[in-house]
């Protein structure tokens, strides 16, 4: 059977033969074969001693260059070999000898070849590493090295990979990154306090490619010839070990201890022993434990370093929990003054964890909630109290959820509702209403709400505070099934149109489901009154289904009290009852489409005009005569937007003209009744929208001016982001969205 060393040497010979071929194709093929061979056996467990063990000797040259900011109580050691000694130093740190340096070299070549794109572009530290490569061949920063192109760096990478196949080659920064990925441990790259301008690129902790929770770390130092007090030239790498390990090795060599054949302690027992007696040395336990010397001292050093950190984090987290139980969080600056070791991100992580997990009910006694301290109690009407005593599933779910989450839901719903009414609440007024919400959270919610409400218009009226809001669209007409929940007093105020404060809009104890029902009633009222076309309904109420609009629209047609008068009835009404800015003149309505002025074809029609020209009771979509028609969005300068044309064309295809050949009751007598009408309308509208969007993307892709998502969303706000990227990926993969 072939031994391990012979297999490694055969792999290196195959890689060296593949280097002679042009390009990297042959070398990558050899690397794939080498990976299969090397995967048949793994690296041995890190244990020192055995055949070929090297006596530890301090490197005086590297010790003179050892920086002050490096880990203390550590010494660089002498390592024998050829080249830059990177793999020899790593083998010495892990196994106490340099016998596995060739295997580390072969595994590094395979790692760098098979993950070439990751080390050049995909890694988080790729820019830092490439900048370090620029300076690795010089002692100071120079314009020539700074201006090296990416193609030159790729060529240097390929040349270094090919050179690594030979034992006498020199290593670079990316070899350290590849070694960290192979060994699955962190590597502390120690750089001398020379070459100050380029030192930050080399003196750093290098993490493996698969960055899991890695705690082990190797210390490797850049050593070489000192030129001046500020410059030095790198020549080789030196392994760095703890001072205790060197002393213990010297003591063990002078006073050898006879082996003890008793049972060895498992690693868990060794950790417990270290926690109880942190001053133990390896020489006292070398015969009783089953771990290596380097692992023992690394554990001892980590327990000494991390014991205080763990205690500090424990006390800081419990201090934050106690402050949360008392009714509020400690500000960040005050918290950092008390616990400077805790980072800002950790503070916010703990804060969101307490807000989301309801820690106030699970940890400690019952204390006043943050909602009770942040929002004052408001006396509720008797009707509302009775309704809440009856209870519902949504109210029970809201009571079971943490109070802080309920408060955040109310605050977010209140802000979204104000924006839907074209009212922009300033932060100072919002904070008076909800003092527990931060400024950043307010602006994040406001930005998202504005994105979901494209119909929002910034005007002077939009800057009114929450105290001046009048819910003219909410509560004027309460359905019979919901009158008990609303209460007589609240319904009376809303029906009379009296001004209502922000606390009346959404009471502190109102569950989220009731607020959604109120928005649904407002949308239903606007649709039944004919003041809300389909396009504006989709933009203003994205959470409601399109079929809901058509159901309400059909109900308004069937109700005799809500039916919109026809053209003949509208001509008999007095002229003063019509709004001049929202409706067309009777003369213009009576004109055929061909006699209208060309200017009227380029101006978008108001929603009231679109709704007023419907004279067929069975129709669900407005007729086509009232909509401006254009051949394409690009053909009419100054005309309506592309999205408006799409909606208008969809309405034309789904509606029936006054002079159409089909009877007016054809659609009403379709199979399935009103449900069938709704389904057909939804399918036709959605298909038309998607077809227009696909055609737009396909034309822009063919003209090599593909739009960004922001531009696409402005033209097609009803299309989801995922759908845009799905179509974009299909186009770039060579597929066709629409044939013809």
UniProtKB/Swiss-Prot annotation:
Record localization: Nucleus
InterPro entries cross-referenced by the UniProt entry: Vertnin-like, VRTN_OTU_dom
Coiled-coil boundaries: none
This protein's UniProt keywords: Developmental protein, DNA-binding, Nucleus, Transcription, Transcription regulation
Highest taxon above the source species: Eukaryota
GO (cellular component) term, any one: nucleus
Annotated stretches, region: Disordered: 485-506, 560-616, 653-673
Positions with biased composition (Polar residues): 653-667
GO MF, any single term: DNA binding
Residue spans of biased composition, Basic and acidic residues class: 578-604
SS bonds (residue pairs): none
Keyword Iron attributed: no
Knockout-associated phenotype: Deficient homozygous mice exhibit delayed embryonic development, impaired somite formation, failure to initate turning and lethality between 10.5 dpc and 11.5 dpc. Mice heterozygous for the allele exhibit kyphosis, decreased thoracic vertebrae numbers and missing rib.
Family of the protein in this entry: Belongs to the vertnin family.
Biological role stated in the UniProt entry: Acts as a transcription factor that regulates development of thoracic vertebrae.
PANTHER family hit by this protein: VERTNIN (PTHR16081:SF0)
Protein name listed in UniProt: Vertnin
Source species of the chain: Mus musculus (Mouse)
